[in-house]
Amino acid sequence: MSSSSAASIGPPQPPPPPAPPEEEKKCLNSELWHACAGPLVCLPTVGTRVVYFPQGHSEQVAASTNKEVEGHIPNYPNLPAQLICQLHDVTMHADVETDEVYAQMTLQPLNPQEQNDAYLPAEMGIMSKQPTNYFCKTLTASDTSTHGGFSVPRRAAERVFPPLDFTQQPPAQELIARDIHDIEWKFRHIFRGQPKRHLLTTGWSVFVSAKRLVAGDSVLFIWNEKNQLLLGIRRASRPQTVMPSSVLSSDSMHIGLLAAAAHAAATNSRFTIFYNPRASPSEFVIPLSKYIKAVFHTRISVGMRFRMLFETEESSVRRYMGTITEVSDADPVRWPSSYWRSVKVGWDESTAGERPPRVSLWEIEPLTTFPMYPSLFPLRVKHPWYSGVASLHDDSNALMWLRGVAGEGGFQSLNFQSPGIGSWGQQRLHPSLLSSDHDQYQAVVAAAAASQSGGYLKQQFLHLQQPMQSPQEHCNLNPLLQQQILQQASQQQIINPDAQNIQTMLSPSAIQQQLQQLQQMQQVQNDQKQKIQPDQSYQVPTSAVLPSPTSLPSHLREKFGFSDPNANSSSFITSSSSDNMLDSSFLQGSSKAVDLSRFNQPVASEQQQQQQQAWKQKFMGSQSVSFGGSVLHNSPTSKDGSVENKIGRDVQNQSLFSPQVDSSSLLYNMVPNLTSNVSDGNLSTIPSGSTYLQNAMYGCLDDSSGLLQNTGENDPATRTFVKVYKSGSVGRSLDITRFSNYAELREELGQMFGIKGQLDDPDRSGWQLVFVDRENDVLLLGDDPWESFVNSVWYIKILSPEDVHKMGKQGNDPRYLS
């Protein structure tokens, strides 16, 4: 009896369950998919908001079919150039025939009301997790011949393949690799030839024939964390000249995608798109946070230098430098007011023909920019966000910088003027930041002005003695005044309230009184300088010291960061404490002067002016000395009202009471970074590129030494030691003049922090080295010439892979730091 007839005896067997669909049956390996897609591919995160560009989608169709959009294709005037959508689903696929990877995304446009709803920006996207142990090789003619084998570079074979047993002659082993469809391929790995080399022989020709590989295609071998060998394919771009009859024509594909997007935008319904990372010139589905950062928080201009990442043949990345030559619409007829490829560029290298003539803002990294986005590095800041004030990520007012005030429509109110800060994209502060009593403000301004021994503030006060002009005249003069003040601040490394702030907040009588007091104090200092000699103890009489706010009420002392009058008078306070002397209320109060629409309003009532005079008298009666970010108090004092202080031989100490003390350094350390007035849409009154915009809302990086260096130490000609910081470790000082190149510096830093070898190859280890220059710009270590780096470095930051990962979650793209 045959087995088939025997099997029929007995109870009938239940029918087998239906086979699941191909997509449900297999889940593609994400690591292999991203490796095949390329190191620059970054898929958005499911559940986040993205910006979809139909114009970029059309480019993918044109690149795939080798046919541009024809003029007879109907235009859809109701289809915006960019659609803000909710990303509901992302699925990774690979073509069964060609192994070409692509992604399927389900999008749903947001209506204007949803765009204005509170939204917390998520990460920039799913970072392309490139494998650490892999190699990519472009196939040659001999690699694809039926009689030969696949030649593997020696270092690649030793790093990726399991080790050979060299006791055998010849050394050989069998390799089993899985492709994107989870199909196993077996190869014979042998080490032979003259000279000896690694070859894949048996099984290789079968693989080449089955995959229809030709010279120019690339293969990837990956050794993953599960000790598995993965195999991927990247086909060379070969546009099809003749499309199969089963495939839609190019015109039909263009019309289809435009019609689907227009219908979805009109009905707020879901629609599906396909993204082919190897065929598409650029990503056309961008995370909303990345789009906002690039378009509204990075100001560019014609002539600005930039760099951009490109993929190399070895599946790594390389930066190319260029210059911005024009900012305009790429297609003003079909896609007006579009940010897609709105930047026309010129490339430096002779291979510029291979680079695109136009790029998008989120693809480039300007070299001279003033970002208004939260710092990339979670270093200690001088001024944390104040309690009771809504932050950028507040639950009740999340992402308030993405929303307009009453009557504005968020994205619907966009004006395409030029990439940078638009009227809609201006940052706005919570009203509580702008509410400060005039008397408190006047008191703090008086203390700050009195602590300056002359120089910059005195010049500003003298300038303000001129008769007050009409509001219209001030509106005309304000930009010029701001530009002059900002230039002076840049030269003296200070951030100072402009003349308008002081003029609107202090009455003429108060200014005159403060001028007289400044002159008296400077004369006293001149007298003291003649009496002081080195190596002696001195008693500073009460008339010789500058006034301080020690007589303020306790609630104001706490509010403005003044020290306790009962504290030890012989000790210096850290720079962070002195920086806090002028707190948010003062800063925000001063920023009100930027809004010239309020210039004709009364500054203070008569009662407030009387309170101001009373506060000034209290300030002038108190006693303290402010030096370069440190405050020396005289309370408690001795019976005769004086305090003893040792003055050493140090030149710095000898100059403490000198009237020639650099007022810029005093003001730099005493007054923290000023918060710009970004409420009520008046950011346009502040010049672009201003340091007000750079450090206003986010504070600045603190000097962990406690006191900012003096001007001599900040001089590049005299300062050779730089600070090096690493999370979880104590900061170190390093003399960079000991080294002659980056390799020596990396080796020393690796030994110093116990991570030897991790800094040599950042692409493999994940560790990154960045530095902050004297202009407070964050740059990648190694991009600049060595001499330029030595002359400009302020401090160095070592970023672990975890630090880079955290930065990605904060809404930044760590690829631009790799």
UniProtKB/Swiss-Prot annotation:
Which Gene3D superfamilies is this protein grouped with? 2.30.30.1040, DNA-binding pseudobarrel domain, Phosphatidylinositol 3-kinase Catalytic Subunit, Chain A, domain 1
Which Pfam families does the record cross-reference, listed alphabetically?
A: ARF_AD, AUX_IAA, B3
Per the record, where are the segments of Pro residues compositional bias? 11-20
Compartmental location: Nucleus
**Biased amino acid composition, Low complexity:** 1-10
- Looking at the record's lineage, which domain of life comes first? Eukaryota
UniProt GO cellular component terms: nucleus
Q: Where is this region: Disordered?
A: 1-24, 526-565, 629-648
What region holds the PB1 domain? 719-803
Reported tissue expression: Expressed in roots, culms, leaves and young panicles.
UniProt keyword terms in alphabetical order: Auxin signaling pathway, DNA-binding, Nucleus, Transcription, Transcription regulation
GO annotation, biological process = auxin-activated signaling pathway; regulation of DNA-templated transcription
Compositional bias ranges of the Polar residues kind: 629-640
Any idea which residues the entry calls the DNA-binding region? 135-237
General function of this protein: Auxin response factors (ARFs) are transcriptional factors that bind specifically to the DNA sequence 5'-TGTCTC-3' found in the auxin-responsive promoter elements (AuxREs).
Q: How does the record comment on the protein's domains? A: Interactions between auxin response factors (ARFs) and Aux/IAA proteins occur through their C-terminal dimerization domains III and IV.
What family classification does the UniProt entry report for this protein? Belongs to the ARF family.
| Name the record gives this protein | Auxin response factor 12
